[in-house]
Amino acid sequence: MSLSDPLGDMLTRIRNAQRARHAACVAPASKLRANVLEALRREGYIRGYAQEDLRKGVAQLRIELKYLDGEPVIKEIHRVSKPGRRVYSKIKELPRVYAGLGVSILSTPRGVLSDAEARAANVGGEVLCRVF
């Protein structure tokens, strides 16, 4: 299956699994997806993830979702920069998500970082998604 936006597909799988109260979900593996999941794990939005090999050359990511008192930790997760319209931001121009309660995930020259990590490193980049 050909996807025009693989990262958007993974974010949709996470959103749907959380709404259905699943403990975990799976998505095809890629380096960008794994890096975004690592940033979400560091920020406390998911419990963890693991790469599983299905067969030679084909892998998937198993994403362990996180809940607090039975409610999903991720209330909203949206793709910002899309294949048809890329969104780049200097770090000084990057707005805070819900006045600092949420997180933006950026692809920077230093790797995939949360907005707080990017501000500390003073580096901007492509705004991949916003999470609250």
Curated annotation (Swiss-Prot):
InterPro entries assigned: Ribosomal_uS8, Ribosomal_uS8_CS, Ribosomal_uS8_sf
SUPFAM superfamilies linked to this entry: Ribosomal protein S8 (SSF56047)
Pfam family, one: Ribosomal_S8
Keyword terms: Ribonucleoprotein, Ribosomal protein, RNA-binding, rRNA-binding
Highest taxon, organism lineage: Bacteria
Entry GO CC: ribonucleoprotein complex; ribosome
GO biological process, one term: translation
GO molecular function terms listed in the Swiss-Prot or TrEMBL record: rRNA binding; structural constituent of ribosome
Subunit structure: Part of the 30S ribosomal subunit. Contacts proteins S5 and S12.
UniProt cross-references to NCBIfam families, sorted A to Z: PRK00136.1 (NF001109)
Family as reported in the entry's similarity comment: Belongs to the universal ribosomal protein uS8 family.
Functional note: One of the primary rRNA binding proteins, it binds directly to 16S rRNA central domain where it helps coordinate assembly of the platform of the 30S subunit.
Protein name: Small ribosomal subunit protein uS8
Species this chain originates from: Gluconacetobacter diazotrophicus (strain ATCC 49037 / DSM 5601 / CCUG 37298 / CIP 103539 / LMG 7603 / PAl5)
Top-level taxonomy: Bacteria, Pseudomonadati, Pseudomonadota, Alphaproteobacteria, Acetobacterales
